[in-house]
Amino acid sequence: MRGEGKRNIITTRENPNILRPPQLNECTNTSAANMTENTIPASMAGRIASYSITPPSAPDIEIAQAEHRITLINRWGIGPGHRVLEIGCGQGNTTAVLAEAVGETGSVDAVDPAPPDYGAPFTLAQAQAHISASAVGDRVTWQNADPVAFLRSGSATATWDVAVLAHSVWYFASSAVLAETLRALRGRAARLCVAEYALRASEAAAAPHVLAAVARGVLECQSAESTANIRSPLSPDAIAAIAAGAGWTVERQGMVVPGPGLLDGHWEAGSVASQSFVREVEDAVRDEGMRLVLASARYAVVAAVEALKGERVRTMDVWVSSFT
């Protein structure tokens, strides 16, 4: 979930060598040709990254993250004056870019159910406070709440121009919870914008990320108490089907192929290939059959990484969509 800069959306129509997965509904894909005046220049990534709390040793990581989110928000056409509801804001990496995009006349309500002390090396509370103290901080209102509870609470009559779920779908405890959230958003937001990993790799070096995500998802679904970043690794088709069931219609969809600066694939593959993953399986899984499946899944990740012969693991494709 960190930055591909100026890379354009690549679709199967534009690249016939990519195997097309089954699609729920074929729609127009966003391209540079139909961008609006709301486009944020990639050159602003450094400034936007400064709004977020960053380890002094790794400024490039935060810049890459900002670049990626600039790409997403440009695809969605979010701009000055928009009232945005962000579901699953986490530490606010997307929030910072949204706040820049909406300008002084717009606003961002950023909702996340995680406790304030969640996260490392910085907690949710620390990261959000840093953004609040930045040049765009007064455009953001943080809500530490379950999204559905928030929508049914004192904000029961509030409406937004757009609701955003940027790399937050996989954090949901289940597809049922996602469906309930999307139903609650219907009638409250004019548009729904979703970005999530696509479970496909246009770059061969991203294959280990796909395998690692599936392995992690299988492990985390063994525990109802999991708070890991991959609990519901839904495919684009599955997300679109859930959205359709909640009353949403696909407006546009396409793929972003991340550049090498987006390191999530590298991190996720490394996590699954590590011995700590083996210990997690031993601690959390009692069924021998499931242990065997997870051992094989980890083996596939290790083998895929070794096949790269030292090349760094890339991050898988990202599905970018909007609904009305």
Label every model-predicted segment.
Residues 63-82:
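Conserved alpha-helix/loop element of class I SAM-dependent methyltransferases that forms part
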Residues 91-104:
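Conserved SAM-binding loop of SAM-dependent methyltransferases across substrates and taxa
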